Every structure is written in C-alpha cells, then in structure tokens.
Amino acid sequence: MQLSNRAAAREAASRDVLAADLRCSLFASALQSYKRDSVLRPFPASYARHDCKDFEALLADTGRLPNLKELLQSSRDTDKQAWDLVSWILSSKILTIHSAKKAEFEKIQQLTGAPHTPVPTPDFLFEIEYFDPANSRFYETKGERDLIYAFHGSRLENFHSIIHNGLHCHLNKTSLFGEGTYLTSDLSLALIYSPHGHGWQHSLLGPILSCVAVCEVIDHPDVKCQIKKKDSKEIDRSRARIKHSEGGEIPPKYFVVTNNQLLRVKYLLVYSQKQPKRASSQLSWLSSHWFVIMMSLYLLLLLIVSVTNSSVFHHFWNRVKR
C-alpha cells in the first residue's frame, strides 16, 4: 500500500471518524458472515493468493485492529499494516460517506412521507455522496422524472456489498410480488428486515448494529407500486403488478424496482443495540457470591439458635430481666 494511500486514509478518518468506523463495521460484518464469499465484495486483493481468498489471515488482521481513535493517536511502526487494511476499507472511486446530523432524519421522514406509527430515531445517520461518472449517469437516467424516497431493510452483513455494488433486483430473495428490489415508505416495515447483527468489535458505534438504507428511486414505469394516474384519482394498474407475480398487486407502502439503474442508496440509518446497564459493584458482587452469602446467613442462624438454647444464655438472660 502506498504511503499516500495511508495518508489519505488517516486524513479521511480524522475528518469523520464515525463514517470511517461505519465502513470498518460493515466490512467486519461481511467478513464474519457464513456467506462471506458472496457478501464480502469487493475483497482486498492483497489477501487473495493463487486465486484463493485467505479469509483466515484477513480475520486475524481485522481482529488486531484497534479502534480508530486509538489508531489515529498512535505512531508505532507496527500500525502500518493496520493502516494498510483501513486504507483499503476506506478507499472508493465511486462514493464517499459522511456523518449527518440527526436533524436530517426529519427531512428524510418528510421525503418518504410522514409515518403513521411512531418510529425509532436512528442512533447514527450517514449520507452517501457519489462521484462522477456514477452521479451524472444517475441524473441522466432521471431526466425530468421525480425522485421517490423509500427504505430498504437488509441484514448488516449485506451492506458492505450494497454500498460498493448497489442494490441488484435479481439478487433479491423476496419475490412474492415478482422479481425486483423491495422498498417501503414505512420505516417500521423496513426495520423488520434489518435485524441487529455483529459488526466490528472495536467500533465506536457499538459492536452490534442494525442498518436501514434510504434510497433515491427514479419515478419510472419500471418501479412498480400503488400510484395514481397523472391528474386522476384512479390507480395506475400497469404499475401495480409485475408479470408472473404470485401475490397479485403490489401492496400499499411498497415499491418493487425492476431496473437496477433506477435506484441508489442515499442515506444509512444506523441503530446501535443498547447494552444493558452495568449493575453497581455491590449488586454485582452480591449476585456473584450469592451462594456464599446464603450459607453464611444459614450458619449465622444456626449459631443464634444454638446460643439462645444454651443454659449459659438463659442464665444471663434471667439476670438481665431482674
């Protein structure tokens, strides 16, 4: 890895450590998955030897990565290998990710439609910006059409590939209403498909995360949904059903995108699993030594009973009462 790449990665991590941490977390989640051969794409070429992916070496090196704040503060020569790996994780010629303020979530809710049920506010919010030519190509495809904003839920291990390769309709396993990428205007529905998963052990975001994508979708006939005809209250049936659909028409609040060029991920909503609060040290000690405590109390009770039944105790007690 060239020194300039390390310097660029250090600068990127210094500028937005949480965004850099997110990319490390998504990478680590894909690496730990039993489907890692398919979800860890792209894969670092330096760990591909003789056309074989050395997952064990990559797992070992990833496990040795300190958290990014520690890595930024360190200047040890032994950290060069760590920076080589982080540099690869953060490198992209297509996009960049940066942290967004939580107030941006209100804007997202407006873009997707006000929720009918209370939805949890994400712990972290990130925005993706695309470089040319990918960005200009998307807007060329859009032309004069409107943009639809909708949520896509998926397992954490899939997001490394989703970010770098996009959402591909032919890879989607949910096909009740036809082949395509399924999205929804209801965040609570998307969260069902985004269970918490193990990310990076040293993540500043937390070791267990859930992620939901907010997608920009070009309003095109290849995007199937319950939508009204222009200047009419009647549903456009040509867009409400996909050929060979087993479930009939697309339900309300859902979108099925049948063309990969019509959508891209714009935001990432990240939820960190709350760790149970630590009990006080006293409670912790009591819970750890409950058997010893109970036995001690039992022995103390036996001692009290024994003493109270003794003649010496009765003699002393009678003298006290006089």
UniProtKB/Swiss-Prot annotation:
| Lumenal membrane side | 309-322
| Annotated transmembrane regions | 288-308
Residues forming the PARP alpha-helical domain are 5-91
Q: Could you give one GO CC term from the UniProt record?
A: endoplasmic reticulum tubular network
Q: Which reaction does it catalyse?
A: L-aspartyl-[protein] + NAD(+) = 4-O-(ADP-D-ribosyl)-L-aspartyl-[protein] + nicotinamide; L-lysyl-[protein] + NAD(+) = N(6)-(ADP-D-ribosyl)-L-lysyl-[protein] + nicotinamide + H(+); L-glutamyl-[protein] + NAD(+) = 5-O-(ADP-D-ribosyl)-L-glutamyl-[protein] + nicotinamide
Give a GO biological-process term. IRE1-mediated unfolded protein response
Q: How does it sit in the membrane?
A: Single-pass type IV membrane protein
- Write the Enzyme Commission number(s) for this entry: 2.4.2.-
Q: Sorted alphabetically, which InterPro entries does this protein's record hold?
A: ARTD_PARP, PARP16_N, Poly(ADP-ribose)pol_cat_dom
Going by the UniProt record, its keywords in alphabetical order are: ADP-ribosylation, Endoplasmic reticulum, Glycosyltransferase, Membrane, NAD, Nucleotidyltransferase, Transferase, Transmembrane, Transmembrane helix, Unfolded protein response
- Whom does it interact with, and what assembly results? Interacts with KPNB1.
Q: What does this protein do?
A: Intracellular mono-ADP-ribosyltransferase that plays a role in different processes, such as protein translation and unfolded protein response (UPR), through the mono-ADP-ribosylation of proteins involved in those processes. Acts as an inhibitor of protein translation by catalyzing mono-ADP-ribosylation of ribosomal subunits, such as RPL14 and RPS6, thereby inhibiting polysome assembly and mRNA loading. Mono-ADP-ribosylation of ribosomal subunits is promoted by NMNAT2.
Q: What is this protein called?
A: Protein mono-ADP-ribosyltransferase PARP16
